Amino acid sequence: MQIILPDILQTWAYARLLNPHYDGAKLESSLWIHPLVAKLFDQKGQKAFQNDYTSLLASLMYSHQGKVPSRRCDMMNLFFVYDEYTDVVSPEIAHRLSKIVVDAMKNSDEMSPCGEHPIGDKAKEFWRLATTLLPATGSNSDVCKSRFINLTEEYLNAVTVEARDRNEGTIHSVKEYLTMRRATSGAGLMLALIEFELDLPKAVLEHKFVQALEEIYTRTRVSSGQANHNLITVVMHENPGLSLQGAFDWLGSYAAGVVECFQTNVRNLPSFCDVEGPACESVDGTLQERVDKYISGLGQAVRAEDDWAFETTRYYGEDGPKVRETRVLVIRPVKRITRRHLLQSLEIKYSMVRG
């Protein structure tokens, strides 16, 4: 069976870019995260981390951030480990771990309590390293740090709910699913890390057009390792008469509207040249230049997600480049083809669909 995938970013203005320090950052971050992986997973479980796909995503997403790119890789590796680990624990344990991580980041300068969970220790270490990315003379570092921790808490709380839903076999409506996945995908954290070197004031981050662009980005980041949290599964569950191809066609139509909305908001973004005050001053360019870099980072992040899905073997095996070029996805049959089998095969081969 063949499915034609929608070319969601056909008119996207941002081309593929890879951080030139990718190889070194990947090696450094892999060595950094390995002790945690070894503590949490057995030999079989550790195989999921051998290829370090997350460092490629970080290097595609933060292609312009040349300063210590390994810290971006660290973030993605840490939360990938967290996500994989909470997939196999109870909702109660997931909730407890979320509290441990947030507390570790809020109190990163304090000694860890005796018997601290290794995820808490690693979160504390990550946060100490990540904050070195903030400009030494920045005026908005506290705003940036507070925003990142709040987004971390939002993400971890959502992952806890996801664990509960998985435990109870819950399948959401499309609207509920999109709202949930904007949090569980960690999209806000990805964007918050773009801000770290830009020293953007609160007035910019709370501007309605900037927030609209951030919201649109989060709609493109829909991925999961569980069939109940796959958008195509949700669409077909809500529309029992819809074929698999019809579900992808629905996705293509929805995504086209999202892309157009992003482009419209970029065109309507006002100038920040006249904004003044201590919080707007920086040694790294005018406020308008820094805002432009941030918006470019949003666009690049969307492109990175799409490129990454096809360039790793995680979703399409060795067929990624061919699938990207032809847009044809082959769903391999099982002995007895059922709707459930098709969705499970689809989840393995195309779990990086765009919402």
From Swiss-Prot:
<keyword id="KW-0460">Magnesium</keyword>
<keyword id="KW-0479">Metal-binding</keyword>
<dbReference type="InterPro" id="IPR008949">
    <property type="entry name" value="Isoprenoid_synthase_dom_sf"/>
</dbReference>
<protein>
    <recommendedName>
        <fullName>Sesquiterpene synthase-like protein Agr11</fullName>
    </recommendedName>
</protein>
<comment type="similarity">
    <text>Belongs to the terpene synthase family.</text>
</comment>
<dbReference type="GO" id="GO:0046872">
    <property type="term" value="F:metal ion binding"/>
</dbReference>
<dbReference type="Pfam" id="PF19086">
    <property type="entry name" value="Terpene_syn_C_2"/>
</dbReference>
